[in-house]
Amino acid sequence: MRRKKWFVALLCAVVGITAAACEGNSDDPSTKEVENTQERTQQSERETEEGKAEEVELHILAAASMTDVLTEIADKYKEEHPEITLTFSFDSSGTLQTQIEEGAPADVFISAALKQMNELNEQGLMDEDSIIELLENKVVLIKSKGSELDIASFEDVASDKVTMAAIGNSDVPVGQYTQTIYENLGLWDQIQEKANYATNVRQVLDWVATKNADCGIVYATDAAIEPEVEIVCEAPEGSCMPAIYPAGIVKDSEYPEQAKEFMDFLKTDEVKEIFENYQFTYIYSE
């Protein structure tokens, strides 16, 4: 009997010592420091993962004539959305249309004509509800600054006064507008004989600015940003459809919510003012 009591007493003592040791370890400063370090590491990892999740790259495909204005708008947007990277592809609207059709990364498309946007939408490649008519531009005839070329109208380009005229090719909206204008004037055959075809409107602008062409046909906004050219005149009234710039979200956008936020930014008064500073006519309305 005494042995049993002695054994029970010994067992209780062992349990008590073990419990005390555990309690002592829980208060050990080195143990707490390890636990705190682990918590901080886990918190840092969570914050890093959250930060990575917020970083987004939006691919904006836009007509070449929008290069300067969208570059300024992008700077403004970055101030308000530092987590968003805007990556632009500027080219002719026809080239950009082909890129979207072939599956190139694209979140937002801004065309220099309705034709390309409508064709993409008919193929089911655009979010139809997101498409808006954003801007209007003017088609103008230009010559190099200080040029003595004696022309005053689109009709004069067909005369012997002009040896080479720079125009956009057939898949470039400004080239399509040019063809329509001269077909309506009954002068398209004469123009083709002296035409030098460019891949986009900025190439037309460059050829005239560097005097590699006598004259050229561009948008008013392009002429406004190039000091080495001057506007001769606007296209004859009624000679072509208005140069409307539609914008919309690509159906397969990887980031449709962020693309919508960028589209909403284009609708603000702040951005409207920037567009107008570059001589665009802002036509969007709710």
Task: List each model region and its residues.
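A short glycine-rich beta-strand->turn/loop micro-motif centered on a GG-aromatic cluster
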Residues: 6, 87-92
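A short, gly/pro- and small-residue-rich
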Residues: 123-131
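Exported/periplasmic ABC-transporter solute-binding proteins
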Residues: 22-75, 94, 101, 113-114, ...
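Periplasmic-binding protein-like
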Residues: 106-111
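Short, glycine-/small- and polar/acidic-enriched structural segments
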Residues: 131-137
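Signal peptide-proximal N-terminal region
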Residues: 76-88
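Sec-dependent N-terminal signal peptides of Gram-positive bacterial secreted proteins and lipoproteins
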Residues: 1-26
